[in-house]
């Protein structure tokens, strides 16, 4: 049974390596590279599978890198449908500097996707034999894809009776919100970009989330705050989660681990609070692993008791806004 259909339009081959020190001009001798299938929806599917959810991944691939991406997805054991592209799938590079512990991320532009290619992705969604509980769209839109693409996906999700979950930014975000989103998961930077204003404290984040809910009918807004945890707002809930303190090896994929864990718990019948707790633990667990290895289920279970969730009281919110 398919609980979750995950979609990404801009997948990648994620390559991670390390070097003693990053310096200009001279050759840098790197450690043996690790290769992972990457992109928002791909990573969400990888994590959801680790949490026992039935998942299907839909993604476009092209060229020799696209062939490698398919092999990497198959290696993860993810049921998938790949749409052929004329251009090459992109690659991303993460370099860990051993001397300082700094992480450098080089993100290459995605291939141009033609109208027939992105329409093929929509056709696959519309013709799904399964009726998923959730449809997750995550990641940026590559060149050639219109900003209302995720809005079209939202419409298909509604037709299939699936709850639509979105993690993206820019014009694609607002267009999709107007069509209808069940759960929105921005990070703080993405929330600020969407608002066109700087919000930082809990009260301002909650107020912004409530405005999104009131204006667009979104049911849940979860803002991930990295090492500072996360804030969840719905029509009747305002929760603040504190993240466990962990040693950061790589922050790549923490947000995708957060979302993958949350949706998989919801899709397998658990409560919103349980899903939120697992999401925060998964985000923390992801930074313990190298590159885009994402969270390990055993690490998530170990960190879970350290996640503290509390209701944000009206007085706290008023004080934060006043401050």
Predicted regions and their residues:
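Glycine-rich phosphate/adenosyl-contacting loop at the front of the ribokinase-like
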Residues: 1-58, 67-68, 313-323
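General beta-strand structural signal in soluble alpha/beta enzymes
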Residues: 6-7, 59, 82, 136-137, ...
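Glycine/charged-rich beta-loop-alpha catalytic/anionic-binding loops adjacent to active sites
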Residues: 22-32, 105, 236-247
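Short beta-strand scaffold segments in enzyme catalytic cores
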Residues: 46, 93-95, 229-232
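Short, conserved phosphate/pyrophosphate- and ester-handling motifs at nucleotide-, phospho-/glycolipid
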Residues: 48, 187, 255
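Conserved N-terminal subdomain of the carbohydrate kinase-like
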Residues: 50-133, 302-323
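Conserved beta-alpha-beta core of the PfkB/ribokinase-like small-molecule kinase fold
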Residues: 133-205
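Conserved phosphate-binding/catalytic region of the ribokinase-like
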Residues: 155-159, 174, 178, 202-323
């Amino acid at each position: 049974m398919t609980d979750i259909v995950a979609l990404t339009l801009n997948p990648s081959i994620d390559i991670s390596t390390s070097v003693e020190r990053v310096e200009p001009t001279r050759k840098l001798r790197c450690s043996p590279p690790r290769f992972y299938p990457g992109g928002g929806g791909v990573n969400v599917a990888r994590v959801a599978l680790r949490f026992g959810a039935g998942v299907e991944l839909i993604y476009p691939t092209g060229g020799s890198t696209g062939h490698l991406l398919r092999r990497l997805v198959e290696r993860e054991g993810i049921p998938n449908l790949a749409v052929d592209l004329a251009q090459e799938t992109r690659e991303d590079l993460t370099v860990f500097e051993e001397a300082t512990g700094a992480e450098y991320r080089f993100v290459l532009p995605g291939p141009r996707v033609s109208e027939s290619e992105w329409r093929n992705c929509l056709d696959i969604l519309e013709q799904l034999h399964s009726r998923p509980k959730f449809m997750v769209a995550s990641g940026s839109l590559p060149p050639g894809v219109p900003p209302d693409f995720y809005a079209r996906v939202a419409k298909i999700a509604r037709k299939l009776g699936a709850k639509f979950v979105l993690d993206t930014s820019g014009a694609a975000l607002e267009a999709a919100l107007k069509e209808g989103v069940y759960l929105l998961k921005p990070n703080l930077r993405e929330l600020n970009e969407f608002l066109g204003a700087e919000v930082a404290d809990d009260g301002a984040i909650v107020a912004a989330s409530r405005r999104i809910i009131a204006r667009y009918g979104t049911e849940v807004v979860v803002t991930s705050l990295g090492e500072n945890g996360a804030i969840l707002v719905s029509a009747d809930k305002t929760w603040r989660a504190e993240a466990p303190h962990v040693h950061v090896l790589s922050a790549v994929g923490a947000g995708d681990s957060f979302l993958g864990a949350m949706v998989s718990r919801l899709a397998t019948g658990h409560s919103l609070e349980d899903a939120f707790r697992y999401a925060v633990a998964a985000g923390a667990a992801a930074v313990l692993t190298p590159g885009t290895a994402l969270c390990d289920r055993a690490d998530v279970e170990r960190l879970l008791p350290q996640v503290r969730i509390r209701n944000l009281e009206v007085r706290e919110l008023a004080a934060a806004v006043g401050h």
